[in-house]
Amino acid sequence: MNVLIIGVGLIGGSFALALRDRGLAERIEGVEASEEHARRALERGLVDRIVTLEEGLPSADLIVLATPVDTIPLLTVKILNRIAPHQVVMDTGSIKGELCEVVAMHARRGRFVATHPMWGTEYSGPDAASRGAFAGRTAVICERERSDRDAVETVERLYGALGMPLVSMEPEEHDLHTAYVSHISHITSFALALTVLEKEREEQHIFDLAGGGFESTVRPVSYTHLTL
């Protein structure tokens, strides 16, 4: 199987490592907007080569979207516009409601499988990618009945080979539960950072004086797009 990973960062890079370690892909190519991330992805051997979307799409059996969650809906539509009938598209984003609405009426909706592997850290980029990240973690599939059977089976086999239990949910149910178990911690971090910065205008001084506990607590503020 030839795999194209769009966004070779924490999730995309870890996914690539998992595919390699289990011999699930003959070739892994990556699409990466950041030149530095592209360089590191190649240096770490996460992908065989970095390509443009136009270069990578035709030969890919599976296309994995692992870009920031706010970019996934329109990117999914763009990819569905270009794929062949045999290709499978899946995403790894943590918000499903908007995405499933955007692709609902697309002529190739059946080739898309909306998924969310329930794993992540506060770090990002290809250097944050780690081996064994997904084993034992739950993978959620949303609107499986809207996807073609062979597309769902491809994704289920893949997640199964990575040692991930599968759960089916509707998008709204997924987003509600994810908000409780994941996004609330990001909101709390954001509120803490705003409170401290309201009192301390010199942001760098805060991190110079504060210990590692404070820094690790407010680091998820980079995820504020999840709450907007």
Positions of predicted regions on the chain:
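Rossmann-like NAD(P)-binding element
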Residues: 55-83, 87
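Conserved small/polar residues in nucleotide/adenosyl-binding loops
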Residues: 224-228
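NAD(P)+-binding Rossmann beta1-loop-alpha1 motif at the extreme N-terminus of oxidoreductases
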Residues: 1-53
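Active-site capping/gating segments
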Residues: 113-141, 146-147
